[in-house]
């Protein structure tokens, strides 16, 4: 093989909106409310190997806005990307898929969610940047704790 074939390779093959739903269970009455909504945001990342060097990474976001105890809107969206990743050492592959890929996808997700919110008739809500490295490290720590707990428990049961 030539040196070019052994070079680390990272390519975005496709970025796409995989799924999106919007619910407004209390409209049109909710538009008459004067109070500012409270907004809750949840983000998750999943990755799947599609082929030897091809990965699908999905960043999911759920935004729930409530006025008092009434849901103004609920948006769920999944922004996905297909990435071709070759000649990357195994110890660098997981962070690349868990940090770099979601960082690339998140602006698309944020834009799609913001667009859906304004098209639904609500004032714009801009999602803050997310530190995917911190999320990745937090997820790793949780996995290590779970593995340590399972290793110390008899018959594979977790200790309380």
From Swiss-Prot:
The keyword Protein transport applies. Its main location: cytoplasm. GO terms for cellular component: cytoplasm. InterPro entries: SecB, SecB-like_sf. It is found in: Cytoplasm. Coiled coil: none annotated. Belongs to the SecB family. One of the proteins required for the normal export of preproteins out of the cell cytoplasm. It is a molecular chaperone that binds to a subset of precursor proteins, maintaining them in a translocation-competent state. It also specifically binds to its receptor SecA. Homotetramer, a dimer of dimers. One homotetramer interacts with 1 SecA dimer. This is Protein-export protein SecB.
